[in-house]
């Protein structure tokens, strides 16, 4: 898993502008660049497949050629435009694209590429322990693409699950929750996006909460945790937070813990929180750049 993160970071840094030894350092990063870099580092911490490091130039050329000839991105798109787009995709996106195109299925990633990442490996072990105890978990992530990856892992491990995120039809949400909460339900896991699933839902069918990636605002994660702490819950609730050591994850958790002392009204002010997050991103990036 550590090698995966290092390879992803190296791939990311190779795409960044660099300056020769002895040259003047680059100008300070603006907010847009800081946010983009920070998001990139968060992706690496969550799962290396969220960036591109496994698909090299040869694979990119093959994928681009097939997609161009088959008009996957529109028959009017030139090969150069197709290749430019394909290069911008993450390993997971490319894996899905290859799976959709029969001629490229040989380029799909192996199961080890999904479950070998640090967080995913820890999650797989944790789920085995939870299942053995007869417990059932809610798994929250801020990223829909992370939920996509977790779906793949859960299927591979044979866990039954349901999912709810921002794209879930409003009329289906209660049906999904009812199916999970139903006494004797054989659905083991409930995947939720932190914001979409963080309010108004009663999910007392679970007694375990797993926060896959923490939010800068601790109140957001607490709202997610509260899905288990609702009227009708008769069991103790256990909360797990997955944090990748040596990454921006650790700093986010530290910042969130400091904010717990702030008034809830302040934390609910979107303008204040946006400014706080921007400041935190700058601080973290500056520390990483030394």
Identify the residue ranges that each predicted region occupies.
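ASCE P-loop NTPase motor core, strongest for the SF2 helicase catalytic module
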Residues: 1-70, 78-290
């Amino acid at each position: 898993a550590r090698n995966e993160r290092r390879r992803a970071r190296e791939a990311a840094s190779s795409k960044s502008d660099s300056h020769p030894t002895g040259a003047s350092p680059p100008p300070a990063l603006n907010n847009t660049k800081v946010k983009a870099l920070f998001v990139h580092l968060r992706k690496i911490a969550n799962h290396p497949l969220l960036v591109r490091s496994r698909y090299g130039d040869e694979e990119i050329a093959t994928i681009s050629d097939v997609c161009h000839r088959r008009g996957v991105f529109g028959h009017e798109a030139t090969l150069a435009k197709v290749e430019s787009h394909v290069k911008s995709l993450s390993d997971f996106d490319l894996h899905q694209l290859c799976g959709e195109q029969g001629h490229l299925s040989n380029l799909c990633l192996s199961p080890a590429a999904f479950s070998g990442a640090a967080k995913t490996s820890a999650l797989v072990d944790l789920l085995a322990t939870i299942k053995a105890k007869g417990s059932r978990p809610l798994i929250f992530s801020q990223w829909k693409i992370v939920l996509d990856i977790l779906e793949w892992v859960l299927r591979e491990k044979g866990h039954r699950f349901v999912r709810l995120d921002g794209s879930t039809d409003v009329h289906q949400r209660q049906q999904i929750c009812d199916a999970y909460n139903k006494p004797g339900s054989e659905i083991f896991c409930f995947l939720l996006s932190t914001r979409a699933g963080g309010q108004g839902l009663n999910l007392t069918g679970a007694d375990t909460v797993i926060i896959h990636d923490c939010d800068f605002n601790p109140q957001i994660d607490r709202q997610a945790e509260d899905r288990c702490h609702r009227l009708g819950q008769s069991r103790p609730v256990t909360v797990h937070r997955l944090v990748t050591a040596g990454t921006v994850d650790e700093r986010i958790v530290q910042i969130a813990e400091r904010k717990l002392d702030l008034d809830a009204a302040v934390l609910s002010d979107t303008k204040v929180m946006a400014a706080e997050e921007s400041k935190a991103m700058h601080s973290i990036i500056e520390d990483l750049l030394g």
